[in-house]
Amino acid sequence: MRLILCVSLFVVLGCSSTIQPSKTIKKEEIVFNTISKGTLFGNGIEGILEEKFTIKNEKQWQVFLNKINSVNSVSSSFSEININFSNHIIICVFDTIRNTGCYAIEIERVFVEKKNLNVVYKKKEPGPMEMVTTIITQPYHIVKIEKRGEDHKFINKN
């Protein structure tokens, strides 16, 4: 019995693992501040399609503000308007124009991986039994992060 136990122990301890240790890719989470999250009600007149983009300078920001305010004064509800673009960039996600309410879009996470800035967002739609308003809407989410020099990629979590 001892012989079987010793042989079994020798076999188990003597075997080397063929599993290679995986290289872990370091992900750096980026803190973001929401500038605004809500819905446009301009029936697309603002000229903002279903888009995901970044704003990296004051000129782009002013063009964007003029666009988003073309129907309603949307930027009046922004948490901040004066952005220091030498230190920050703006990330925007806009859903498609919808025929009803109860839709939403949200940036959930921003992280850097392999020198790429990754923006993870999620869309929400009404359930099959949920009562919705009959109004044309376009959900959006706008956030500010510290300036990063990396390329950016948008990832739809749905």
List each model region and its residues.
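Sec-dependent N-terminal signal peptides
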Residues: 4-13
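Exposed, flexible binding/inhibitory loops of compact, secreted disulfide-stabilized domains
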Residues: 15-158
